[in-house]
Each structure stands twice: as C-alpha cells, then as structure tokens.
C-alpha cells in the first residue's frame, strides 16, 4: 500500500501548519500551532544540532477528547550503509486511547532532506526500521 504525507502551512493560522496523511483510501488531517514552541523550523534546527536524534514533538488533534496524537522524531537514517547517512523524520499517528494504554501504534517512517521541504513525500509501508 502506498501512502503520502504532505506538510503545508495552515491558511488559517500563519504560525501553524497542517499535516495531511493519506493511506490507501483513508485520509486524515492534523494541524496546530506549534511555532511558538516547537514548530517545523525548530525541528530543522534540532536536526542539525542533535546528532543522536530521538528528539520528539507531540501534537494533539481533536476537540475536547483528542482523537489523534502525532509524534515527530528526529532520527539518523542509514539508507545505503554508513557512508550514506542523513536525517530522517519519523511520524507516528496514535489514537488517544491506544496512546494512553501504551499500545504499539501504527508507525510511518519516511526519509526527508534535512531542510524538511514543505512538499508531498511518497513512501511505502515497507520503510526500513530506523530505530
């Protein structure tokens, strides 16, 4: 199954952004305003500053009881051996109940340039484990 993720700035909040997640015939939108504390620009800066990765940002999406939680993790990715390492971003999508029970959530792994271009990135669900 192919899936895609698209980063874009929100039209309603200049400090915010939206993430569109497509998986098969399912589509989910998450969005928020983290620019004051942990925005996308901070993710880029963290990627260049923290060599070991595992720096995470959590974001809730939903009214009242959150229906999704999104976690961004900066990780080091080996694509084709140690000589070809680059920064990657792991995106985990949780439902709130599963997250609270610490159930293993579905995981989406993607490799992006360190610039985190605000463009659609296509990946497959057979992405390598980057832990």
PLM segments and residue spans:
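N-terminal low-complexity, intrinsically disordered segments
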Residues: 1-83, 88-96
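Long protein-protein interaction modules used by eukaryotic assembly/scaffold proteins
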Residues: 71-131
């Amino acid at each position: 199954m192919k899936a895609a993720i698209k980063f874009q700035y929100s039209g309603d909040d200049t400090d915010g952004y939206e993430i569109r997640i497509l998986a098969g015939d399912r589509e989910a939108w998450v969005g928020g305003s983290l620019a004051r504390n942990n925005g996308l620009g901070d993710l880029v800066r963290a990627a260049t500053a923290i060599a070991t990765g595992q720096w995470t940002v959590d974001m809730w999406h939903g009214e009242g009881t959150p229906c999704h939680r999104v976690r961004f993790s900066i990780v080091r990715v080996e694509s084709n051996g140690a000589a070809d390492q680059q920064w990657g971003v792991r995106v985990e999508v949780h439902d709130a109940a599963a997250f609270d029970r610490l159930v293993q959530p579905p995981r989406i792994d993607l490799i992006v340039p360190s610039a985190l271009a605000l463009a659609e990135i296509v990946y497959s669900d057979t992405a390598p484990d980057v832990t």
